[in-house]
Amino acid sequence: MSEHSFVWDAVQRVRTGAPLVHNITNYVVMNTTANALLAAGASPVMAHAREEVEELAGLCSSLVLNIGTLSKPWIESMFAAGRIAQSRGVPVVLDPVGAGASSLRTWTSLDLLRELNISVLRGNASEILALSGAGSRTKGVDSIHQAADAADAARELAGKFGCVVVVSGAEDLITDGSSDVLVRGGHDMMPRITGMGCTATALVAAHAAVAGSVLDGAAAGMGVMAVAGTMASRKAKGPGSFQMHFIDALYGMQSFDVEAGVEIVR
């Protein structure tokens, strides 16, 4: 099996299986995230009300906990949905948006990691460093570090919490603490578009729901993200059209696009 085969296999599994991805995510990205999941072949539900999250978590194939627009009721919903999802053995993916920027974001992320069985932690380098206790701060929700800067912190967090950690950047690092995968691809226009990291988290959740292992699912999700970015860059004239072409790329992606659009290093 080539290093690209597991990515294409996961793409096909998402398209045929249409996994239900329950997103407790932020107001900024709800529409973009839902459209990306639909284009990839998954089935999104965007629900955060405490009164229904347990019921929906009982149906989902994976759960996204994204702290981008955090508030106390949403924190309660995240814990409630997370407990149901973990009891069913479905992947729970945490996006610690802006961890390090405020105490609320940092401590909520750490509490979720401590109290739930998080399957995948996906963040930028500054967020991962902040959660590791390295003392990093973010520029708002943006990273001021490269993925390689957080490699040791990612492995430490993976070992401490028994999860896969994804550090996104120009080169993505995916690690379970003992095995690493590097994903290279995409385009430097991607950081100019709000919510691309949140889209990556949702794609990781969709592919983790169907892959043979959480590590492969996370790597496949980031690989798909990179391929779609590479494809979109060929047609886009700026961030606005890039986002449109990115969604189209998720929908139309073929095996030869995967072969040409991303480099996977194990």
UniProtKB/Swiss-Prot annotation:
A Pfam entry, by short name: HK
Gene3D superfamilies recorded: 3.40.1190.20
Keywords: ATP-binding, Kinase, Magnesium, Metal-binding, Nucleotide-binding, Thiamine biosynthesis, Transferase
Reactions mediated catalytically: 5-(2-hydroxyethyl)-4-methylthiazole + ATP = 4-methyl-5-(2-phosphooxyethyl)-thiazole + ADP + H(+)
InterPro entries: Hyethyz_kinase, Ribokinase-like
Gene Ontology process terms (BP): thiamine biosynthetic process; thiamine diphosphate biosynthetic process
Pathway stated in the Swiss-Prot or TrEMBL entry: Cofactor biosynthesis; thiamine diphosphate biosynthesis; 4-methyl-5-(2-phosphoethyl)-thiazole from 5-(2-hydroxyethyl)-4-methylthiazole: step 1/1
List of residues binding substrate: M46, G195
Record GO terms (molecular function): ATP binding; hydroxyethylthiazole kinase activity; magnesium ion binding
Organism domain of life: Bacteria
Cofactor annotation: Mg(2+)
EC number: 2.7.1.50
Annotated positions binding ATP: R122, S168
SUPFAM superfamilies: Ribokinase-like
NCBIfam families: PRK09355.1 (NF006830), thiM (TIGR00694)
Family stated for the protein in its record: Belongs to the Thz kinase family.
HAMAP family (UniProt xref): Thz_kinase (MF_00228)
Annotated function: Catalyzes the phosphorylation of the hydroxyl group of 4-methyl-5-beta-hydroxyethylthiazole (THZ).
This protein's name: Hydroxyethylthiazole kinase
Organism, scientific name: Oleidesulfovibrio alaskensis (strain ATCC BAA-1058 / DSM 17464 / G20) (Desulfovibrio alaskensis)
